[in-house]
Amino acid sequence: MKLIVGLGNPGREYELTRHNIGFMAIDELAKRWNISLNEQKFKGVFGAGFVNGEKVILLKPLTYMNLSGESIRPLMDYYKIDVEDFVVMYDDLDIPVGKLRLRMKGSAGGHNGVKSTISHLGTQEFQRIRMGIDRPKNGMKVVDYVLGRFTSEEIPDVNHSIEKAADACEEWLNKPFLQIMNTFNS
C-alpha cells in the first residue's frame, strides 16, 4: 500500500494559491486514477483505490499547512504504512515555477508543512516531490506570495509541473524512488 500526500490549506480562499500546489497534484492523481476524495477522517480528506494492482491512498490534510503531520501520522498508523511507502508533494520557493525536485530525505528547508510532518513522523527520511513556485519579486512578503494565486503567465508551467508530479507518482508505484529521482531531476 502506498500513501501520497499533497500539502496545502483547506478552504475556498486558498484554492489555486501557490501554497496549495500539493493539493492540486493530488486532485490530478484522483482524476487520473478515478479515486474519489470523499473520506473525512484523520483531520484530512482522502480516498483509496487500486492502480496497476497497487493499493493507493491519496490524502489532503485539512489541518492547515503548519499542522500537516497531525493528519499524516494517524493515517499512516491506522493503515500501517511504512515511511518508505509514503511520498509528500509540496510547494518550494527555491525551485522555479514549472520545475520539480525529488528527494529521498532531508530537512524541512523552512517549509512548515514539512517541518510538522518530520516532527510527527520522528524522521526526515521520507520521499518528497518539491514543486517549484519561485521566490517573490519586488520585495513582496513571502507569506503574501505563497498565499497568492499564480499569474496567468505562470499557469502553463504550473499545469506542466502538476502533470510531471503525477507522472512521477505513477512511476513510483512500479519503480524505486531513487530511479524516478534520476529521471525527473534531470
Swiss-Prot record:
Site positions for Stabilizes the basic form of H active site to accept a proton: 91
Lineage: Bacteria, Bacillati, Bacillota, Bacilli, Bacillales
Function: Hydrolyzes ribosome-free peptidyl-tRNAs (with 1 or more amino acids incorporated), which drop off the ribosome during protein synthesis, or as a result of ribosome stalling. Catalyzes the release of premature peptidyl moieties from peptidyl-tRNA molecules trapped in stalled 50S ribosomal subunits, and thus maintains levels of free tRNAs and 50S ribosomes.
Organism the protein comes from: Bacillus cereus (strain ATCC 14579 / DSM 31 / CCUG 7414 / JCM 2152 / NBRC 15305 / NCIMB 9373 / NCTC 2599 / NRRL B-3711)
Listed name of the protein: Peptidyl-tRNA hydrolase
Pfam families according to UniProt: Pept_tRNA_hydro
Positions with a binding annotation for tRNA: 14, 64, 66, 112
Catalyzed reactions per annotation: an N-acyl-L-alpha-aminoacyl-tRNA + H2O = an N-acyl-L-amino acid + a tRNA + H(+)
Domain of life per record: Bacteria
Encoding gene (name): pth
